[in-house]
């Protein structure tokens, strides 16, 4: 068996903070949108998050082979593998590393498919990618972050798709189409599909431990 792991280290330098200018009084300006990876060593945007692969080569139940697929990420929260590469939520981005020969080495820099996942609260950022049998990529958005999503590769790019958190979203990579699948569910972390394609998510909402999401539905929110 093979295990893909995202190692998420708390973002040490929110949104790539840096001083841009000064005059008679100090004036600090903050970049609201860090650039997408890759980030060279020494870059203020380079993080310590990484995606690793662990393999049990002799089927004894112990992972004996370990490999880093990509490192230097910042706030990488989930990974999903398809036939030709690897999807990663690295807010504010959804990125895709092609690996068409399946050698566990990225074929190049990632494609940035979506931009605009909120960074207001690192405990609630976009997370939990899973590839559905319908070809859509599903993910969750927690309780205290917004989103203003731009479909970077769409030929019919319209205005940003805005949401205020607490939802399950999905993305069709063949049509470059993003949409809100269902709203509500609190601080959602974790997305699962059962054998019939039904979608579930867990959260930290007291006595309620999770929701079954139906397309287009609107569930309880905690604000």
How does the language model describe each region?
Residues 1-223:
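Beta-propeller blade termini and top-face loops
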């Amino acid at each position: 068996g093979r295990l893909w792991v995202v190692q998420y280290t708390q973002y040490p330098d929110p949104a790539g903070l840096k001083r841009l200018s000064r005059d008679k009084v100090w004036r600090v300006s903050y970049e609201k949108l860090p650039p997408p990876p890759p980030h060279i060593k020494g870059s203020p945007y380079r993080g310590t998050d990484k995606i690793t692969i662990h393999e049990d080569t002799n089927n004894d139940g112990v992972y004996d082979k370990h490999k880093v697929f990509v490192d230097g990420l910042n706030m990488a929260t989930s990974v999903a593998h398809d036939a030709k590469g690897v999807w990663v939520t690295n807010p504010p981005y959804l990125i895709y590393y092609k690996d068409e020969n399946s050698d566990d080495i990225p074929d190049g820099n990632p494609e940035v498919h979506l931009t605009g996942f909120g960074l207001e609260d690192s405990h609630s950022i976009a997370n939990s990618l899973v590839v559905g049998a319908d070809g859509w990529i599903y993910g969750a958005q927690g309780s205290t972050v917004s989103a203003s999503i731009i479909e970077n590769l769409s030929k019919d790019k319209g205005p940003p798709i805005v949401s205020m958190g607490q939802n399950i979203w999905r993305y069709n990579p063949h049509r470059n189409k993003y949409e809100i699948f269902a709203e509500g569910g609190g601080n959602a972390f974790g997305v699962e599909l059962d054998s019939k394609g039904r979608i579930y998510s867990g959260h930290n909402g007291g006595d309620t431990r999770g929701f079954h999401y139906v397309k287009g539905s609107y569930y309880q929110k905690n604000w």
